[in-house]
Regions:
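Alpha-helical substrate-recognition element adjacent to the catalytic core
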Residues: 2-161, 166-175
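C-terminal cap/substrate-recognition subdomain and adjoining C-terminal extension
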Residues: 119-144, 148-298
Length: 298
């Protein structure tokens, strides 16, 4: 009879969470380079796309009511994040129409990811490889939910930075088809906003739960941006905001809507919270919250 406790489920964002910085520009320049070998120079087209998005986002941000400083609850912030859907989907559609990712195969994406890590164009946060090892050792489960353009690029980064422990991991993210059109997880609608990430997290957890007789002892979500707000604050979820210095846009949002996140290393037995922050995965491993360093989970 198996008397082991139910596993912990970790769900991770990718850009700025697993990686130190956003990788969208790195991916875009890879697409530009691939198309250039076929005689198509899309560099200027990409910068137009980039500028168009920036202008649209600025108009939406400054025109939305209630203004940022006046949004004081999770519900108000979630409503704002969901209001960005048409803007984000419009941007994804323009990327699809540009053909920047046309005819880039899965193997090319993975090789590029490996090369980008080796060159230092992409860097993962401190302790990520050890985090994967400890999660697997603890028989916990983990997966990735991301609005990134390429799930295969994510898989390449995971394989190159965490080895065999990451090869069979569920990655729910967008991906381009052969014509360069961006599709969402399982070839569904593009995933671009916080509500879509929440739905993806629930889908991932349901798949994992169906293979477990005991369910999960804890569900932990780790993210770094506004698109993570619904996952971080979902009922029954322990949220960890990733921040290099305990500052930044997401931390500001969480402080504004409350409760403010506490550092994962400051947790003491008998005191509980559902919202934390960490600088990197090394701090998450050492935290007494999850027992990943061989200590007792609290």
């Amino acid at each position: 009879m198996d008397t082991s406790p139910p596993p912990i489920a970790f769900v991770l964002d990718f850009d700025g969470t697993i990686t130190q910085e956003d990788t969208i520009s790195t991916i875009a320049h890879f697409g530009i380079a691939c198309q250039k070998t076929r005689g198509n120079d899309l560099e200027n087209a990409w910068y137009i796309l980039y500028d168009t998005y920036g202008e649209s986002f600025s108009r939406s941000f400054h025109g939305y009511k209630p203004a940022e400083a006046d949004r004081k609850t999770v519900a108000e912030e979630v409503t704002y994040q969901r209001a960005l859907k048409s803007l984000e989907l419009g941007s994804f559609n323009r990327v699809s129409q540009s053909g920047i990712f046309k005819e880039i195969g899965d193997d090319q994406w993975r090789k590029f990811a490996k090369d980008a890590l080796e060159k230092g164009d992409v860097n993962v946060r401190k302790g990520f490889g050890d985090f994967v090892k400890q999660v697997n050792k603890a028989k916990a489960t983990w997966g990735v939910v991301s609005v990134n353009f390429s799930s295969q690029f994510i898989r390449g980064v995971l394989a190159a930075s965490a080895g065999a422990g990451a090869t069979e991991i569920e990655v729910l993210a967008n991906h381009p088809d052969e014509e360069g059109k961006l599709l969402g997880p399982n070839d569904g609608p593009v995933m671009a906003t916080s509500d879509a990430k929440l739905a993806a997290m629930k889908d991932l957890l349901q798949k994992r739960k169906s293979g477990s007789k005991t369910g999960f002892s804890k569900v932990v979500y780790i993210g770094d941006s506004g698109t993570d707000i619904e996952c971080l604050t979902a009922e029954g979820v322990i949220g960890i905001a990733m921040s290099t210095d305990g500052k930044g846009r997401l931390i500001d949002i969480l402080n504004r809507i409350g409760p403010s996140p506490v550092h994962v290393g400051s947790q003491q037995e008998g005191k509980s919270s559902s919202l934390y922050w960490a600088r990197n995965f090394e701090e998450i491993i050492k935290s007494p919250l999850f027992g990943l360093e061989g200590g007792r989970e609290i």
